[in-house]
Amino acid sequence: HWYCPLEQYTSFIRAITDYSTGSYCLPGALLGTFLAALVVRGLGLTGNMARLLDCVAPGGALIVVFIRLSALFNSSCRSKIAITTPLLQHLPIGSGITNSMGAVEYRFATFFVQAILMLCVTVLLLYFFFARRRLPMKEGCPRDGNVAWMFLTFHSAVELLMDSTRYDSSFMHFNAFVSIVQIVSAVCILAVLIHYSRLSHKVNGRCGYHVAMWIGYVLTLVGTGASEYLVQRFGNMYPICYTVMTITCPMMAVIVYLMYQTTCA
């Protein structure tokens, strides 16, 4: 967060030591969780960091639910989509905010919808932890760490879609078009897909299934990227662009999950 709105901080040291000003960015919070796990392992409090992250993953998803709900009724939601239909000007679709002129206007309730989606991800991860995690894996494929990988995948898919619907102040200085959250989310999904592709290739050998999965991933990535470009360039293309992204973003996560299944015994 320090990198994005530099004007909020006097220095980097002040940003990481003075918490009375400024804000945070979710990718940084996730990185902090990973670093905390490294510290725990370094102190000898756990011998299996992957299993520790598996235990943390469902709670991490639930934390995002409360973070988004806590920011629902303030200016940090900053949804781009105006809700003009009176029937939709209430939760879960719309929420009222006070603009700079003191008037109330209704915007898409981005954080509320994201909280609902992350609650679904929490339930999915709990099922994955108590049921899927115990399934045997093919020789050479670790059983631990898969819940954390799935959290990274599905949380990133949700962020990739929902962050597009709001004005996010966290963007690269050389490119204000796509937010850092979206960039990190796309990279995370790609990293998890590469991880499971390598495992699957090691235990199953090279096959057409891998090619099909990667073609599907590229198509969904292109669909997501093109929709994001069009929705930023042409404001009146919200309906069609977000309809496409509502399909392609979850499909990216599903493709990762299907690749994971090829490593199960």
Question: What are these regions, as identified by a protein language model?
Answer:
Residues 1-265:
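Hydrophobic, membrane-interfacing alpha helices
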